[in-house]
Each structure stands twice: as structure tokens, then as C-alpha cells.
């Protein structure tokens, strides 16, 4: 069952040797910043998912897969809508900054989402936009336990883009030429169009469908095997995980048949009690990852290569189409070793000497390799002999990651045919050769990169109870890490001292003060340290006399928090992060005399500002948690409002203009803290649990809503409607359309559209916002929220039903309130672009009243293809993200065997999308298609 305790989501299913129950632990421990806490003592801004239990009924392949379906505050992209500019939320795996995609769900015990500023303040600057704590599994005292899991399934393509065939494309391209110039001659004759459309000779008159089953499969396999071994005694315990998966590819020709991704991983976690006072743990993980692909970007070619190209020559032509009497052609063909399947040669044209099909067959292959080694060790010392409740913890970690690319880089020849028709049959009478076959047989290495992470933390902890009612806690922490990345001079660093002081009376009244002294090398001396304080107050109303004996309320907790976090992760201007407070002088410009001597002059390109300071996250939040009717319903809801203040500007408009000149390109303006952004919103998680006869049901609903606003922005515009201040941070700005021009008279009577291309009937007409009788960038207005940091409202629904030994699980997620622009090459078609099916709704004189697409143009159509509400669409959607049915073999069958537990399951992921724009949302352009995943798995515990 899925049960959410206050601020806590736990997925509960039958344990491996017991029976299912709606009951849960009274107060499970939750990993938060630098400590574990009983869930009942959490003060808001924290949500957690018990992944170990969830995996028993929901098999996943990614650690953060659809977590928005279980908790509030996480929308799949961000925590509380915080941006990911320069750096987003911090991910810590076992307390060390690591990537979420390098730990598999089978390795994870628990994931904690730290949303509120009060929850992340102890981590310092790098966690200013939230943190996700991933805790891996640990061993437990007891006998040896072995768990084996095997999965196999198929990724099935959801949809492919639809493009016009050769004949239709050629017809419409001729139309585009006439649209641009009514006196233009057609590029393609009626005979050529007929030949390409009839299929009379697809090798001479190509009509290439890149999504044909000749090249693309409907599905590809993914298989995975995992072994988990754990056990130990009172003194030492261990957990190990060995896993391997391999994923195929949808392409099914040439070298691409062998496209694959595979990953092998070994993890070992050991806990040792050295004595009654000292314990330690060691975690190690090694990952080997490979991605092999054929040369050539097939999916990009599928979105850009026209169906009739190369002209007069299909990329692959049968050898037997060569006239037997054309001996010179046959002799020339004998110089190549690239005869595909013994019967096709590589073809093209002088203008197209390469193509993606030939690349896949003859250009070689490329393999990206990644190796990661992660190690961390911790020490825990009980100092009760010094002071009751005192302890010390330390953690040290070293991670290495390296990656490189190996490739076989071959070159190939293509043969350009000369066609003739003998007795009604097309034959090749001559060939010309472009390029040469070159297979050096050497493996090339490129793109080598590496990354090292070193992390350390040490802390004194104090926890004690006085008089049985006064509970006191405290932590004094020194924490820091550095990441060294190849080809980057400056390391990514985070260093801070932190203090936590907590008190509660009878677990009824709570007060918690947290503070961090953060440090940044990005700022000038004297400004590199700042204090980040946070205060949280909590009140458990259910312990008050007026609610203590309530038959409805089991637990009711309310808390409020105020925080100011100082961060340096957004201290960025362009590509520069360091020494932004310093002035910059250059001698790059000058002049030269005709007789040779040259002079350089020294100019300032940036002024100095030693007062440059941290960006601040100022936040107020409130949290309400409740358990009702003996845990029949649990509720966790939060409200938040925060302001990110002091974003940098480098060309302040409030400086006199003479401090910045265009020629020479000089400036005395200094970088300043100025811009502010605000976010306000709420999140919730509601769960209901009920048993109906032999059926246990659990229903969970979670959601996150946030609204953004630019509260301060350095900007100057002539018109009020252009100001970004007061509008959403993720606002989409563009022109307001007013249909399509019907004729030249309407164009002449309308404002002049200075948008880079000649306006003709069938082009998009725009509204002149400022009344200057000109359409340009000054007429752009706010169009809607882009949802860049996740949809404004995110919804999650999960349902679990258990009957006897069957468990049914379903998960749905939704995103609402955002807008997008249809601006891919599928929609914005001009010049020599490939024509998609969308152009069938184009404007013509005959369809002027019903057209859904602007006129076609063989030139640039920048007037039409720019951000405007003509291309705007709502991104509202609801997805059936997962369905799984699990069967657990009854213990009555297994009790006399060496198998403790045996279960089998079938599942489907990414099954359905409900949206007005479903076809658009399920279609990828220029990349591999989206897929549904159908899986079957089995798990055995020994």
C-alpha cells in the first residue's frame, strides 16, 4: 500500500516473509540534512519516498522516475519551481554530491526531497535550490539473504513524424516557388513528379521514407539482471548489489543494428561496530557504461533530408541494374569493398557525396565509454562518557569519473549513376566515382574527460531529554566538497560551517534554529562569507486537550519557517563566474598607419565593484500535517513564498550612458546585484487507505502549484507592455497574430512588417501594439507561462489494490497551466527544408478562408517563423505513467523450499497521454522517438 505519513510517503507492500497490512511503523526514521529524524518530529519542507518498498510493486529503471506521482513539491524538474539556471537542486547519494542517474532503484532504500529553505540551510550555497538525498540500502544482522531479479521488455515507439513523399513534396515546392515569384519556372517537371510518385523505379526516382520498416523497427529490447546479497551479525553487516542491463536500438540496418547501451554496476556497503562506542561504514561503487552507435546522425537526417534526394540516385542501388555491357562501370565498381549484402552499391551525387545510409554501412562506428568509481567512509563515535547525548560523525569521500570516445573512422566512395532506358527498362550505363574507400583499421580516441569529487564533513551532535519532557538537540558541522573537471580551471566548491539547535516540549511545541556560515571564492576579500539563518516553529495541536481525545484527528502538526539563504551558484555573467568584481582592461584594439607602425590603446571593458555580494533566497513557508480516522486519511500540505534577490546585471541602465561606448567597445560599468524574482505556491499529498473485505485499497493524490513573478528588473522600454517586471519568470514573449493576409490590398493597408522577409498573401499578419505603423520586435507582448521549471500545476495519482497474492498498481501524472511554441523543423518549414504533413493545411488562394498554415516559400520566411501566438499551444496533459500487476507465490507453497519469496510481474510504462496536443507531445523531431515500455519480470529471494 502507499501510505503517506505527515510529510512522509512510504510505499508499503508485503514484506518478503510476511503478509500485507495497512499498518506502518509508528515513527520511521527519515534521512534529512546530516542526521536521521523520526518522521513525527519533522517540521515541514521535507518529503520522502520509501523506494525499497515501492520497488516491490513498481519496477523502475531510473531513480527519480515519476516521483511527482507520490509527493508534493517535486514536479519532475524542480523543487518548488526553483530554476535550474547555472545549477539546480543538489543531489547527494549517501551524503556525497553525485548524479541521480548513476544509482539504480534496486540499490536505493529511501529518497528524501528537501524543499524548504529551512531543510537545506545546513548544506550551504550549493543546496539553495533544494536538495534530493538518496540513501542506498544497508545490511542487517541475520542470516545471508540473496535476492535475484530479472527483467526483460520492449520499448515500443509511440509515434513518428509524418513527412510528404517525393511527388507531393516536389509539387508543393513548385508551388512555393510561384508564391515567391509568380513568373518563376517550376523546378520539377510533371514527368519528374510522376516518375517519383509512381514508384516505377525507386532507385532512379527516390521516394525515401526514413521511418519505413526497412530502416526502423517498431520495438527494441531492454533486459536487466540484478543480484542483491546482504547479511551480517551484530558487529558487522554488509549489502552488495551487482546489476547489468542492455538496451538495443530501433534502427535495424548497417552498423546501426549493433547500436546498444549497456551498464554493469557493483556496489558494496559495509557497516562495522568496532566497539560499543565506535562504529564505521564504508561504501564503494563501480560503474561501467558503454554506448555504441553507427556513424551518422540518422534521426536528424530523417527530419531534414528530403525524400527525393540525392536526385536521380537512391542511396543504395542494386548492382544488377548496371547494364552488363557497361564494362567500365563494372570495373569502376570493383574498386570498392562496400557492396552491401553482396548486391547493393553506395550511391549519391556530386553535390551529395555522403548520406546517412552510407554512413551507417561504411563510415564506421563510435563508442562512448564511461567509468565511475565512488568511495566514501564514515566514522561515528559515541561520546556519552564525555557528555551524555554527545557524539561525533565524520565522512570522507573520493569519486572518480572518466569518459572517452573510441571510433573507427572510415571513408567511403559513392558512385553516381548515368541512367538510360532500353526497351522500357531503366539501366545504368555509366558510373562516376566520388571519394575513395579508406579503412585504416585504427581505433581513434577522442573527447576524453574526467571529474574528481572530494568531500568531507565532520560534526558534533548532541541529543538529550531532561525531565522526560524537554527534548534538546544540536549539531555543529564543518562541511565541504570540491569537484575538479577536466578543461575547467576553477573547481566547483562548497564550504561552510553550520549550526543546528532544536528544542521540543513533549513533542508538542517545537523550535528549531539552523544557520550556515557560507564561503565563496567568487567574491572580493571581505565579502566572501555570509550567514544564512533559519528559524522554524512547530505546534502539535493533536496533543492539546481540546483535540487529544478526538475520534477524528490522530495527529495534527502545524509549523512555520522563515529563512534567508546566501548562495553563489547564480553569480554568473555569460561564461564568467570568477573575478566579476574586478575591473577589466584590454589592449586588443588599436589602429595602424599605412607605413606600417601600429598602435594599441588601452580601454576598460568592465568597472570594479568590490561590494558584489551573494544572491539571497528569502523564504517564508508553512506546513500542515494530519492523520485522520486512525490513519484512514493522511494529509501533508505546504505553502511557500520566496524571493531570490540580487541577480547580476553587467550593463546597468541606471549608469550614465557615456560610461559605455560602442566604438571602441569600452565600458566602465561594473557588475551589480540588482534583479529579483519571486515564487509563491503550495504543495499537497493526500492518501486514503481502506480495506474492503479481502481487498486492501490505497489511493494517493499529490500536487504542486507555483507562480513566478519578476519583482525587480533592470530594463528600459518605450512601452509599458514590454516590461518583464511584474510578469512570470518563465514568460513567453512574442507577437500577437491576426490571421493570414488574404491579398496584396490587405498588406498595403496594414502596418509594415519589418521582420526580415517580403510579406505576401498567405503570410501571418500581426497586431501593431504601439501604433507606430510598423511591426517589429517592439510589438512583442507576453503570451503565457513557459513552464520552464515544470508545469505551473503538477498532479500525481497512485492507486494500489491488493487481493490475496495479487497486487495491482497504477500511477498517473499530469502537468497543467503551461504553454509552448511549435517551433521545430516539423512546423517551421521554408527554403529547402523537408516538408512535413503540417504543410497540407497551407494557405492558397483557394483555401484562404480555411488554411491552418501560412503560404509555402522557397526562400526564408522569417516573417512567419518567429515566436508568436500563431504557434502557441497549451501543454496541459495527463499521462498514465505506469501499470503493474504482481503475483506473489503463496508462502504455503514455498515454506518447505529454500526459496523465501517468489514473485512475478508484468508492467507497462508511459502508456497513454490525454491531451488536446497529444500527437505533438508524443512526437520527437530530430531525435529517437518516445517509447512505451512493456516489461515482464521475476524476483526470487533465498
What are these regions (language model features)?
Residues 269-278, 284-288, 320-324, 328-409, ...:
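Extracellular/periplasmic, surface-exposed regions of secreted and cell-surface proteins
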Residues 1-267, 279-281, 926:
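Short, small/polar-rich motifs associated with maturation and membrane association
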Residues 195-219, 436-437, 443-455, 772, ...:
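Alpha-helix-centered segments that form part of catalytic cores
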Residues 147-203, 296-304, 572-575, 663, ...:
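Conserved small-residue
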Residues 183, 354, 358, 761, ...:
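Extracytoplasmic gating/loop element in the C-terminal half of outer-membrane beta-barrel translocons
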Residues 388, 789-821:
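Glycine-rich, aromatic-lined ligand/substrate-binding cores of catalytic
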Residues 96-139, 159-163, 206-226, 245-283, ...:
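Outer-membrane beta-barrel proteins
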Amino acid at each position: 500500500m502507499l501510505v503517506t505519513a505527515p510529510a512522509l510517503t512510504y510505499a508499503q507492500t508485503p514484506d518478503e516473509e510476511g503478509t500485507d497490512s495497512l499498518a506502518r511503523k509508528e515513527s520511521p526514521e527519515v534521512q534529512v540534512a546530516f542526521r536521521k529524524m523520526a518522521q513525527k518530529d519533522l517540521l515541514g519542507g521535507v518529503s520522502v519516498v520509501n523506494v525499497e518498498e515501492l520497488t516491490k510493486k513498481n519496477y523502475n529503471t531510473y531513480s527519480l522516475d515519476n516521483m511527482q506521482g507520490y509527493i508534493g513539491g517535486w514536479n519532475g524538474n524542480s523543487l518548488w519551481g526553483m530554476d535550474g539556471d547555472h545549477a539546480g537542486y543538489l543531489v547527494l547519494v549517501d551524503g556525497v554530491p553525485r548524479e541521480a542517474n548513476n544509482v539504480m532503484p534496486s540499490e536505493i532504500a529511501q529518497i528524501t526531497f528537501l524543499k524548504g529553505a529551512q531543510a537545506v540551510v545546513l548544506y550551504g550555497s550549493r543546496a539553495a535550490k533544494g536538495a534530493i538525498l538518496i540513501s542506498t540500502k544497508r545490511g542487517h544482522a541475520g542470516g545471508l539473504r540473496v535476492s535475484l531479479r530479472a527483467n526483460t521488455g520492449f520499448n515500443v515507439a509511440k509515434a513518428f513524424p509524418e513527412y510528404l513523399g517525393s511527388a507531393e513534396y516536389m509539387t508543393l515546392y513548385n508551388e512555393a516557388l510561384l508564391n515567391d515569384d509568380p513568373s518563376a519556372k517550376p523546378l520539377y517537371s510533371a514527368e519528374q513528379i510522376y516518375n517519383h510518385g509512381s514508384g516505377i523505379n525507386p532507385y532512379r526516382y527516390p521516394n525515401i521514407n526514413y521511418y519505413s520498416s526497412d530502416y526502423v523497427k517498431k520495438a527494441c529490447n531492454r533486459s536487466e539482471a540484478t543480484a542483491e546479497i546482504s547479511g551480517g551479525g551484530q558487529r558487522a553487516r554488509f549489502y552488495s548489489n551487482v546489476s547489468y542491463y542492455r538496451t538495443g536500438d530501433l534502427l535495424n540496418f548497417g552498423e546501426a543494428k549493433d547500436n546498444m547501451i549497456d551498464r554493469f554496476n557493483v556496489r558494496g556497503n559495509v557497516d562495522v561496530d568496532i566497539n560499543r562506542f565506535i562504529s564505521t561504514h564504508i561504501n564503494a561503487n563501480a560503474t561501467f557504461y558503454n554506448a555504441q552507435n553507427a556513424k551518422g546522425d540518422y534521426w536528424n537526417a530523417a527530419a531534414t533530408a528530403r525524400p527525393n534526394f540525392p536526385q536521380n540516385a537512391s542511396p543504395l542501388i542494386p548492382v544488377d541494374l548496371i547494364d552488363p555491357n557497361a564494362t567500365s562501370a563494372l570495373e569502376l565498381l570493383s574498386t570498392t569493398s562496400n557492396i552491401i549484402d553482396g548486391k547493393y552499391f553506395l550511391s549519391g551525387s556530386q553535390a551529395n557525396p555522403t548520406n546517412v545510409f552510407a554512413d551507417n554501412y561504411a563510415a564506421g562506428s563510435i563508442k562512448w565509454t564511461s567509468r565511475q568509481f565512488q568511495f566514501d567512509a564514515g566514522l561515528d563515535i559515541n561520546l556519552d562518557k564525555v557528555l551524555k547525548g554527545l557524539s561525533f560523525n565524520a565522512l570522507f569521500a573520493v569519486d572518480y569519473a572518466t569518459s572517452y570516445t573510441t571510433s573507427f573512422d572510415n571513408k567511403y566512395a559513392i558512385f553516381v549513376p548515368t541512367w538510360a532506358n532500353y526497351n522500357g527498362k531503366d539501366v545504368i550505363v555509366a558510373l562516376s566515382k566520388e571519394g575513395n574507400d579508406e579503412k585504416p583499421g585504427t581505433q581513434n580516441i577522442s573527447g576524453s574527460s574526467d571529474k574528481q569529487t572530494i568531500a568531507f564533513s565532520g560534526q558534533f551532535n548532541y541529543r538529550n531529554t531532561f525531565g522526560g519532557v524537554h527534548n534538546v538537540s544540536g549539531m555543529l558541522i564543518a562541511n565541504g566538497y570540491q569537484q575538479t573537471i577536466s578543461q575547467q580551471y576553477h573547481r566547483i566548491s562548497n564550504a561552510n560551517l553550520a549550526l543546528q539547535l532544536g528544542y521540543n516540549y513533549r513533542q508538542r511545541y517545537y523550535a528549531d534554529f539552523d544557520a550556515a556560515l557560507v564561503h565563496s571564492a567568487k567574491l572580493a576579500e571581505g565579502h566572501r562569507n555570509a550567514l544564512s539563518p533559519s528559524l522554524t516553529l512547530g505546534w502539535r495541536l493533536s496533543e492539546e486537550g481540546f483535540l487529544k481525545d478526538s475520534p477524528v484527528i490522530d495527529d495534527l502538526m502545524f509549523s512555520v519557517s522563515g529563512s534567508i539563504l546566501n548562495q553563489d551558484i547564480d553569480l554568473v555573467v555569460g561564461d564568467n563566474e570568477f573575478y566579476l568584481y574586478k575591473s577589466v582592461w584590454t589592449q586588443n584594439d588599436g589602429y595602424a598607419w599605412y607605413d606600417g607602425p601600429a598602435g594599441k590603446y588601452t580601454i576598460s571593458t568592465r568597472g570594479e565593484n568590490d561590494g558584489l555580494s551573494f544572491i539571497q533566497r528569502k523564504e517564508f513557508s508553512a506546513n500542515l500535517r494530519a492523520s485522520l480516522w486512525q490513519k484512514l486519511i493522511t494529509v501533508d500540505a505546504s505553502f511557500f513564498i520566496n524571493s531570490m534577490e540580487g541577480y547580476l546585471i553587467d550593463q546597468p541602465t541606471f549608469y550614465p550612458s557615456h560610461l559605455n561606448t560602442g566604438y571602441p567597445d569600452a565600458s566602465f560599468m561594473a557588475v551589480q546585484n540588482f534583479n529579483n524574482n519571486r515564487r509563491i505556491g503550495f504543495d499537497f499529498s493526500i492518501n486514503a487507505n481502506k480495506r474492503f473485505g479481502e481487498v486492501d485499497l490505497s489511493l494517493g493524490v499529490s500536487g504542486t502549484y507555483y507562480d513566478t513573478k519578476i519583482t525587480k528588473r533592470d530594463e528600459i522600454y518605450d512601452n509599458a507592455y514590454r516590461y518583464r517586471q511584474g510578469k512570470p519568470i518563465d514568460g513567453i514573449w512574442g507577437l500577437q497574430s491576426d490571421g493570414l493576409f488574404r491579398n496584396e490590398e490587405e498588406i498595403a493597408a496594414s502596418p509594415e512588417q519589418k521582420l526580415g522577409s517580403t510579406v505576401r498573401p498567405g503570410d501571418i499578419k500581426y497586431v501593431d501594439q504601439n501604433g507606430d505603423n510598423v511591426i517589429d520586435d517592439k510589438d512583442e507582448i507576453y503570451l503565457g507561462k513557459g513552464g520552464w521549471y515544470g508545469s505551473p500545476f503538477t498532479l500525481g495519482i497512485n492507486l494500489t489494490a491488493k487481493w490475496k497474492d495479487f497486487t495491482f498498481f497504477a500511477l498517473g501524472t499530469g502537468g497543467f497551466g503551461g504553454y509552448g511554441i511549435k517551433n521545430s523543423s516539423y512546423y517551421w518549414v521554408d527554403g529547402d527544408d523537408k516538408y512535413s504533413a503540417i504543410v497540407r493545411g497551407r494557405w492558397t488562394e483557394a483555401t484562404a478562408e480555411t488554411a491552418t498554415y501560412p503560404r509555402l516559400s522557397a526562400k526564408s520566411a522569417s516573417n512567419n517563423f518567429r515566436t508568436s501566438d500563431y504557434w502557441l499551444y497549451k501543454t496541459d496533459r495527463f499521462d498514465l505513467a505506469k501499470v503493474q500487476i504482481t503475483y506473489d507465490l503463496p508462502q504455503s507453497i514455498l515454506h518447505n523450499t529454500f526459496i523465501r519469496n517468489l514473485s512475478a510481474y508484468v508492467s507497462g510504462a508511459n502508456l497513454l497521454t490525454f491531451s488536446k496536443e497529444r500527437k505533438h507531445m508524443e512526437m520527437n523531431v530530430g531525435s529517437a522517438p518516445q517509447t512505451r515500455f512493456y516489461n515482464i519480470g521475476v524476483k526470487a529471494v533465498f
